Swiss-Prot record:
Propeptide: 1-57
Record GO terms (molecular function): threonine-type endopeptidase activity
Protein name in UniProt: Proteasome subunit beta type-5-A
Catalytic site positions: 58 (nucleophile)
Annotated keywords: Cytoplasm, Hydrolase, Nucleus, Protease, Proteasome, Threonine protease, Zymogen
Lineage, opening ranks: Eukaryota, Viridiplantae, Streptophyta, Embryophyta, Tracheophyta
Enzymatic reactions: Cleavage of peptide bonds with very broad specificity
GO terms, biological process: proteolysis involved in protein catabolic process
Family per record: Belongs to the peptidase T1B family.
UniProt main location, coarse: cytoplasm
Gene Ontology CC: one annotated term: nucleus
Keyword Cell membrane: no
Length: 274
């Protein structure tokens, strides 16, 4: 299918052209492009968009307990079966009292968290007070909703402490927003939920909560090929957020599953077998 220019004839002289024939000669020199050979162009766009989607994976989690909010994440970035990085920072500091997590497209998550941080700072300057966790999550949800259906890939948690205490919200790229006491997002979330749900108690100490978060991330990286690297754990309390630990999941494996030393009988049996 070629672009038809037969309807461009006109009796009015055009600025920059001596006559209508000059304009047609100029148009005829412009290269023509084939149009998509499909009757349903909307369907064609959808198929083309699906072809551009890459498999992604991660594990992030957050939960509320009596001491505040515990946030943890792995650090692996992947595209399908290719591991592009083992040191991605998936917990973003929005302000000294609020954190955001990354799951989905790295560029989308980083951009919208930076954007949210700017808007939270402007709110603080204009109103002489910090924005609430609820307000920040609603602001992010509204921004993402305005780009709904345009190919964004964002699954984030907004965790923080404000005048009402700890707050935790989940926000996705469709503008959805959920409030809860514990969430896990990413391809490794089913494995993290298995550990998190079985060990969660509201009245945990900070040490117990950090250990639960670390163990949940480790087990997710052990079973999910798209998660790995370093398990980072943050705590958000009345004084703001603090990074508690960042442990290589390979070393955590031997912490949770120590290798039992061989007994003398086993050593003798192996030597005899050789």
């Amino acid at each position: 299918m070629k672009l038809d220019t037969s309807g461009f004839e006109t009796s009015m002289p055009m600025i920059g052209f001596g006559s209508s024939s000059d304009m047609l000669d100029e148009l005829s020199s412009v290269p023509s492009f084939d149009l998509p050979r499909t009757k349903e162009f909307d369907g064609f766009q959808k198929k083309a968009k699906d072809m551009l989607k890459h498999a992604k994976g991660t594990t992030t989690l957050a939960f509320i307990f009596k001491g505040g909010v515990m946030v943890a994440a792995d650090s692996r970035a992947s595209m399908g079966g290719y591991i592009s990085s083992q040191s991605v920072k998936k917990i973003i500091e929005i302000n000294p009292y609020m954190l955001g997590t990354m799951a989905g497209g790295a560029a989308d998550c980083q951009f919208w968290h930076r954007n949210l941080g700017i808007k939270c700072r402007l709110h603080e300057l204009a109103n002489k007070r910090r924005i609430s966790v609820s307000g920040a999550s609603k602001l992010l949800a509204n921004m993402l909703y305005s780009y709904r259906g345009m190919g964004l890939s964002v699954g984030t948690m907004i965790a923080g402490w404000d005048e009402t205490g700890p707050g935790l919200y989940y926000v996705d790229n469709e503008g959805g927003r959920l409030k809860g006491d514990r969430f896990s997002v990413g391809s490794g979330s089913p494995y993290a939920y298995g550990v998190l749900d079985s060990g969660y108690k509201y009245d945990m100490s900070v040490e117990e909560a950090s250990e639960l978060a670390r163990r949940s991330i480790y087990h997710a990286t052990f079973r999910d090929g798209a998660s790995g690297g370093v398990a980072s754990v943050y705590h958000v309390g009345p004084e703001g957020w603090t990074k508690l630990s960042g442990d290589d999941v390979g070393e955590l494996h031997y912490h949770y599953y120590p290798v039992a030393p061989a007994t003398a009988e086993q050593v003798m049996e192996e030597a005899t077998a050789e």
